[in-house]
């Protein structure tokens, strides 16, 4: 495991070296906030006789259930004055168990001990040093990336983080260049950094790795058109190419067609057997608060699309609340509907529901199918002393051939305090 001690010392050293005369922008542009998140999750295993049913001390579980309180303290400094500016960011995380009975761990929200029980609390501190030259920013330390080839997971109590270095440049007009290397990851329910692993259905030969290299470019000639390309490598596991086209087409007053096309090509690296081509397209009609989307995802090759294991979210179109629909050779389609109730005079209230179905794959040599139905209802308080308080209910039903069926509910209450 990696403790992050060197990055902490580096950040503290940088702070000490910053000249007081150059700290005007460093302090004036700084921000400090505290996000609180109350998280409850219940996952009911509908059939406990399947090979993939989670177990506790050898016996199949009937459910996983946890309730916890999370705190996320975020500090972001400005940059020192001059052509080359320096700054420091910091992320402090604390998760506290409120309730988790014996044998009900496993939602991914709380830290699990070796005996299968959960810790009463767990925490993490991650500093990040940064430097800016022109419109290019270099960051070294803890990151919470939202990259198509490495997307941090933030679907439970606390967010996942990665340790490494990244540079983002906007010096060229309409172009964003990104490159970096991650050396370790901290899972969403952990206090420590560790080596990265690969998940790819049907693939063999994966090993723990301390190198994830990536580089990409996004070209956005207008607000309605963007094209992206990334290349990535999890050393000794897989190589991956990613291409994406986003386009918004006005059809009539208030009516827009949004197109989102994504392609992944993944091959082996080291001694793995990764071989996957993933092409997905989603088309969404948007009109006065309504959004109706239809997606189709086709996979070819001997394995499923690979991604960094441990809860990292693959940036594929049919990765949804519970399942990712990335089994080897699996094809899947999605129907989604969103509604913003501000169009009906109720600002802050929103609804999302979707249905995803996958087939054309095998489990244990047998033909299989699966589907998932999701429902999200969220509300953000618009005024008064609780302005900004957000409440969300997530409901999931998953059914599949030769797999454990689940029904799931999540209740999330969040509030952010901005100190400055």
What would you call each of these model-derived segments?
Residues 25-45, 84-88:
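Transmembrane beta-strand segments of Gram-negative outer membrane beta-barrel proteins
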Residues 28, 65-71, 121-125, 159-163, ...:
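Residues that define the transmembrane beta-barrel architecture of outer-membrane proteins
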Residues 32, 82-86, 135-139, 174-178, ...:
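Repeated loop/turn-to-beta-strand initiation elements of outer-membrane beta-barrel proteins
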Residues 38, 138-152, 177-179, 215, ...:
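Transmembrane beta-strand segments that form the barrel wall of outer-membrane beta-barrel proteins
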Residues 75-106, 115-195, 217-225, 293-301:
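Outer membrane beta-barrel
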Residues 175-201, 206-208, 254-332, 393-411:
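Outer-membrane beta-barrel translocator/channel fold
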Residues 215, 335, 375-379, 405-420:
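Outer-membrane beta-barrel "beta-signal"
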